[in-house]
Amino acid sequence: MLTHALIGDEGRTIELGWQGGRRTRFHAMWLRDNALDDKTRSAGNGQRLITILDIPAETRIGAAEIKGGALEVSFVPEGKTVSFPAQWLSANAYDRDELREPGWTGDVIQRWTKATMQNSVPRASYKAAFHGRSVLREWLSAVRTYGFAVMDGLPAESGALCKVSDLFGYIRETNYGRWFEVRAEVNPNNLAYTNLGLQAHTDNPYRDPVPTLQILACVENTVEGGESSVIDGFAVAAALQAENPEGFRLLSSCPARFEYAGSSGVRLQAKRPMIELGPDGELICIRFNNRSLAPVVDVPFADMDAYYAAYRRFAELIEDPDFEVTFKLQPGQAFIVDNTRVMHARKAFSGTGKRWLQGCYADKDGLLSTLAAIEHSFKEAAE
């Protein structure tokens, strides 16, 4: 609840007091640009109807008053009065004293290890998720929070993985096709198409933008071995940062190069750090794929030894069983991973029997959009 509003700096700023003693400040220009009235933002989709050039450069707060659960602000020279709900102001306050350390993640992200996740893998049945919005919300929320989830009860048939992506968005087609087969082949153009074990990795780091989601569905599996593993790259990065801050800095500030040229007519290249931070230091992406790593040429000579030491330690932590959650997919099961965070691996399997998986890519914008829409509808229903 708002307790006071104090205009300062000749109307350029305003200080708000909150019950409990908290105080936040806002700039007049920021408030005017983010006004919630129907002349500034579309009532239908919330998109802004004006540009920054439509707002006078000399905009000031002429008057402000707390009315009920809102702050009413009058702007000059426009003579425009706008109401801001207190809850909205609190949620969008940017006047923060704390400085975040590089590598921070939002509150919605929960890092995990084998100890915390092996016996509590998030999962849902396809039928329940398809027919129940609450089940789908919980499953999508798990992907957002943990970076992966399992789905049971799919048809054990070719193309069933599309049913998973259809729950929230669209398949991202690549040079591998709309989806691709993961089974042993003669003369494969990718090590995934063998019965060899695969080191933990993220997929397609040679693309920019990288596919942000991957789905793997099991059609047939009668082999010995071949278990799937997932590793929380954010948890591993945090462990590296805790023991070797300088190594973390090098892997997050120096770009690596990735490339792929395994198919006729396809040559893919990308240059991004293995540990990618946003401009404000937020940990936003892990790219780790030994098979696709090109020569590292963007690290200063003086730092190359330290870079490789950090790279080696990062790989050692990724291989540490304490970070690995393992499960074996059965026909009709699939799992989804956030390809910007969670690495996946495969144990080697026998040459007898059959192991047939199918994989495809999708993007998080569709998943997060669907989740946000469901959460909004539940919130409206509760009001």
UniProtKB/Swiss-Prot annotation:
PANTHER family: GAMMA-BUTYROBETAINE HYDROXYLASE-RELATED (PTHR10696), OXIDOREDUCTASE AIM17-RELATED (PTHR10696:SF25)
Keyword tags: Carnitine biosynthesis, Cytoplasm, Dioxygenase, Iron, Metal-binding, Oxidoreductase
Membrane-crossing segments per the record: none
SUPFAM superfamilies: Clavaminate synthase-like
Official protein name in the record: Probable gamma-butyrobetaine dioxygenase
CC cofactor note: Binds 1 Fe(2+) ion per subunit.
Purpose of the protein: Catalyzes the formation of L-carnitine from gamma-butyrobetaine.
